[in-house]
């Protein structure tokens, strides 16, 4: 493909990270591959496209990641974010219902948050509508991430007694 890529991870020294960001901002590097580095403290406003492959149910983390990409920059009027979510198979399997429902409860609030701010909100929601409806969980399209996160923490503490 001829893309110039560079890793942007915690093992890269701070001074080298700054140089990498400069190269990215001026176009010498077209792709940054980052792990956890977009959660806090890194500004990359020139980014126009991002692919989030590591999911988190922590709203603070995913809002910060998204915010790093959506910052204003000269010549940039929008950004495209692809947030990959994990969902059950399309074919409903009653024996796995509890596992699949748990997965949806974790992923859907983040999806709903991202979709609500997206230009393709209704198209994105329609792609998952039938799947979520099979589990009778359409309410997840409107659940707020912080509410879900607090519920997950409470459930985790309940089971760890």
Residue positions per predicted region:
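Conserved RecA-like P-loop NTPase helicase motor core
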Residues: 4-122
